[in-house]
């Protein structure tokens, strides 16, 4: 079986995301799917999963090959169960991502893109511990707007970016950047290169601030 490049998107769908922000994220997912579908190497290797979190975390889309990937309908309500989302992605990756065996290499280490606009409303310690036990290729956390807790995101990953106003244009730029980074990684994977976090991300656009 060909090695896959798993990509997990963890998306905040709490009540504060209602209206323009959740619509922008919905459109961003369409941008991502379109960009990846136009890239032969991505079509061959990339598998996408969507995990959303509000009062609880749920996997809306299990790890799915691009040709079968359907965008879930996002709805914003409730709180921000970030800890539950971290625990869930760790559990799902344990099940869905193929490990190395003596006979064959497993999947590439997953890429994780996390987006939140607020403060976690659950205790993230258990979920963070489970998340840290997993081997990830790259983990990017995005603070959407000034209300997101950047120090919490820094405890998850060193790669933290911010959208200053969380406008539709900024979300569009964010998803274009994610698309470019996934495409770049899929090309490296296709060339047989081992992927490291340093070379899996493209330089972000001006709308996406590195913290």
Task: Locate predicted features.
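Von Willebrand factor
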Residues: 2-61, 68-108, 111-115, 138-152, 166-173, 177
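P/S/T/G-enriched low-complexity
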Residues: 4-5, 130-137, 143-211
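Extracytoplasmic/secreted cell-surface and envelope-processing proteins
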Residues: 18-19, 120-125, 151, 170-172
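Catalytic-core regions built around general acid/base machinery
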Residues: 32-35, 127-135
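Cofactor-binding loop segments of dinucleotide-utilizing enzymes, especially the Rossmann-like FAD-
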Residues: 53-55, 117, 142-146
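Short, flexible, mixed-charge acidic loops at enzyme active sites
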Residues: 60-68
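Extended, charged alpha-helical interaction scaffolds
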Residues: 108-120, 125-128
């Amino acid at each position: 079986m060909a090695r896959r490049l798993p990509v997990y998107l963890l998306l905040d769908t709490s009540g504060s995301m209602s209206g323009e922000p959740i619509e922008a994220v919905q459109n961003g997912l369409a941008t991502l799917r379109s960009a990846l579908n136009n890239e032969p190497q991505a079509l061959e290797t990339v598998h996408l999963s969507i995990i959303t979190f509000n009062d609880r975390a749920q996997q809306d889309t299990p790890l799915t090959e691009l040709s079968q990937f359907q965008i879930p309908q996002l709805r914003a309500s409730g709180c921000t169960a970030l800890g539950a989302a971290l625990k869930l992605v760790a559990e799902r990756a344990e099940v869905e991502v193929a490990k190395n065996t003596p006979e064959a290499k497993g999947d590439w280490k997953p890429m994780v893109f996390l987006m939140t606009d607020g403060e976690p409303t659950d205790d993230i310690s258990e979920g963070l511990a489970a998340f840290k036990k997993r081997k990830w290729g790259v983990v990017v956390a995005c603070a959407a707007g000034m209300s997101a807790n950047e120090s919490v995101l820094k405890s998850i990953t060193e790669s933290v970016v911010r959208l200053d106003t969380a406008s539709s244009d900024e979300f569009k730029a964010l998803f274009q950047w994610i698309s470019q980074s996934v495409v770049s990684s899929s090309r490296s994977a296709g060339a047989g290169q081992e992927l490291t976090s340093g070379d899996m991300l493209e330089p972000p656009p001006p709308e996406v601030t590195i913290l």
